[in-house]
Amino acid sequence: MAKRDYYEVLGCDRGADETVLKASFRKLAMKWHPDKNPGDPEAEIRFKEISEAYEVLKDPQKRGAYDRYGHAAFENGGGPGGAGFNADFASTFADIFDDLFGGSMGRSGARSAGGRARGADLRYNMDITLEEAFSGKTAQISIPTSISCEVCSGSGAKAGTQPKTCRTCNGAGKIRHAQGFFTLERTCPSCQGRGTVIEDPCPNCGGAGRVTRERTLQVQIPAGVEDGTRIRLGGEGEAGVRGGPPGDLYIFLSIEPHTFFQREGADLYCRAPISMVTAALGGTVEVPTIGGEKTKVKIPEGTQSGKRLRLPGAGMPVLRSRSFGDMYVQVVVETPQNLTKRQKELLAEFEGLSSTDTHPESNGFFAKMKDFFQGASSDND
């Protein structure tokens, strides 16, 4: 039977780049791998065909020869097998085999000899106030976590016994499986890659080598942390398997919304209401700071509502620095309500005394309105 075109086998056009070829090969190899299609002779044929096509097209030199001469380029002993199976090709297959059955092609796994493995990392979510983020704090937390069994010292074996070498893999932790022109390795199902089995498990941990306990830790929260800050505590995660190193603990901080301040980086923003008289004549207004003190803010004469006044260095500390952000006070001019008759009379009298100098914005606005309507009237004439 004549060989199919390699590009047709992989479902790619002749201009496909290496990324497209690799993605297509991976998809087809996953579909037709014999381990996913046991007892299916067609799957074995298709898998070999796919492997051969990719081995040629992934290599620029072989691809060039194929594009020029077709399958004839590899006749008379010049076939695509043999040395063409390089590390990159093996890496691609290894990724596929990991997806298929959690094995590998000679690659080292997370477990070392004897089944030792690093413990899992843990995550702890902590809510803090803006004041605590400003000053920093020492927090005490309790977390349920796996620790090394104190009875068997993490071995998982009953006192006076030792784990035995796994008979299935002879202590290798992996089983070799011949497939075509290469050899696969998969994790031993009997010992789960440890190379040893426990015949007499520790009664305290049931052979796991670890037990769950509640641990209390002191966590130092530095001043200036922001919402979403992550703090890593090395070695405070779950205990390792069979004496492996422990994982880490990650503290994720969430800062609660504040009733008075809003934060942007190291700067703080707040609003302060003032009277019309204070806005017109000037004065001072007292506002709180994030540190708990009160400070007086000078209101310049003629201050308009919405104006922001800056207090240098009154914001949040910058993390791992001696500098501070600023605090911005936005002035909100209150319109008086529930006025007495006399107050209304005085305001009316003031309005009568007003001029373009006292209300430049208003007068400018009405002047523009007048010009607008006059211009519109002229256009209609």
From Swiss-Prot:
Cofactors: Zn(2+)
Ranges annotated as spanning the membrane: none
J domain ranges (all copies): 5-70
Function of the molecule: Participates actively in the response to hyperosmotic and heat shock by preventing the aggregation of stress-denatured proteins and by disaggregating proteins, also in an autonomous, DnaK-independent fashion. Unfolded proteins bind initially to DnaJ; upon interaction with the DnaJ-bound protein, DnaK hydrolyzes its bound ATP, resulting in the formation of a stable complex. GrpE releases ADP from DnaK; ATP binding to DnaK triggers the release of the substrate protein, thus completing the reaction cycle.
NCBIfam families noted in UniProt: DnaJ_bact, PRK10767.1
ZnF start-end (CR-type): 136-214
Family matches, as PANTHER family: CHAPERONE PROTEIN DNAJ, DNAJ HOMOLOG 1, MITOCHONDRIAL-RELATED
Cofactor annotation comment: Binds 2 Zn(2+) ions per monomer.
Gene3D superfamilies: DnaJ domain (1.10.287.110), Heat shock protein DnaJ, cysteine-rich domain (2.10.230.10), Urease metallochaperone UreE, N-terminal domain (2.60.260.20)
Binding, Zn(2+) 2: C166, C169, C188, C191
Protein's name according to its UniProt entry: Chaperone protein DnaJ
Domain of life from the UniProt record: Bacteria
The CXXCXGXG motif repeat ranges on this chain: 149-156, 166-173, 188-195, 202-209
Cell compartment(s), UniProt: Cytoplasm
UniProt cross-references to HAMAP family, sorted A to Z: DnaJ
Subunit structure comment from the entry: Homodimer.
GO molecular function, one term: heat shock protein binding
